[in-house]
Regions:
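Conserved beta-strand signature within the Rossmann-like core of class I S-adenosyl-L-methionine
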Residues: 162-169
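Class I SAM-dependent methyltransferase SAM/SAH-binding core
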Residues: 72-119
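Class I SAM-dependent methyltransferase Rossmann-like catalytic core
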Residues: 20-55
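A conserved beta-strand element that flanks and buttresses the S-adenosyl-L-methionine
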Residues: 134
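Conserved class I S-adenosyl-L-methionine
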Residues: 62-71
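N-terminal, positively charged/glycine-rich alpha-helical extensions of SAM-dependent methyltransferases
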Residues: 1-33
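C-terminal alpha-helical "lid/dimerization" subdomain adjacent to the S-adenosyl-L-methionine
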Residues: 171-223, 234-237
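A short, conserved alpha-helix within the catalytic core of class I
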Residues: 142-154
């Protein structure tokens, strides 16, 4: 497969296109979830460590854990191994095509659906049920095809008292622009694109699936209005996209 063909395959992604990627045997496990190999291969253990450092309820024995859009790279395998060791119950929500890439376990329920559009009744039936919720690297796709308000309301509803939700790896164009406006950012860009190249910075442009500071702050406001504490957290600097992505954490009081 040529590099041009691969770029085309990994562009303009949505729920249905991810189904196609999941069944494409010419792609690696990282490419099936929309990443070129160099962004994820050999790096997901560090990502998992960063997730665990924020979602402290993942260390609980017998916890109920929900992963929205787990994909099929190394991360869901790490989550499932952790769950098996701690006697946790896991629910994975994704397309059937993506879920088929993951092993079956007695402690894991696979739910084929588009969250939150197709899970409204399920969310009501599982109110206050989950001690840990993870939605990593997929929220910007969900936001294009669904209501951000419905997503936030559903997460807040599903969280158990004392539960923690991580909406992780959110691309923030404002954060990106700040980085590439700095000497460090220009050097980073030139290391990857050549010494005569300069990063494009447009403070007034936001593409579909991108968030800016206003969007991030509005998500915090929505969660807090739903009775849940909400925070913006940086990623570990060792992570591949830490200089232009960030995480949001929800915490429900006991």
């Amino acid at each position: 497969m040529t590099e041009e063909n691969k770029i085309e395959k990994l562009s303009d992604l949505d729920f249905n296109k991810f189904k196609t990627l999941a069944n494409d045997e010419s792609l690696s496990r990282y490419e099936k979830i929309g990443f070129f190999n160099h962004f994820r291969e050999g790096k997901e253990a560090q990502i998992w460590d960063d997730i665990q450092s924020k979602v402290l309820t993942l260390s609980m024995e017998n916890a109920r854990v929900l992963d929205i859009g787990p994909g099929c790279s190394d991360l869901p395998f790490m989550l499932l191994k952790n769950a098996e060791e701690k006697g946790q119950n896991v629910v994975l929500i994704d397309s059937q095509e993506m879920l088929n890439q993951l092993p079956d376990f007695s402690f894991c329920e696979k739910f084929s659906a588009m969250f939150p559009n197709e899970t409204k009744q399920w969310s009501k039936e599982n109110k206050n049920a989950f001690h840990a919720i993870i939605c990593y690297s997929v929220f910007h796709y969900i936001a294009v095809e669904s209501s951000v308000e419905l997503f936030v309301e559903s997460i807040c509803e599903l969280l158990a008292p004392g539960g923690i939700a991580l909406i992780g790896d959110i691309p923030n164009v404002s954060k990106r622009n700040r980085f590439f406006s700095s000497e460090e950012g220009v050097q980073f860009h030139q290391n990857n694109h050549g010494p005569n190249s300069f990063p494009e910075i447009n403070w007034n442009e936001k593409k579909p699936g991108e968030f800016n500071d206003d969007d991030v702050f509005s998500i915090l406001k929505m969660a807090r209005e739903n009775g849940v504490e909400a925070f913006v957290l940086p990623q570990n600097n060792a992570l591949p996209m830490a200089n232009r992505r960030e995480d949001i954490l929800f915490v429900k009081h006991k």
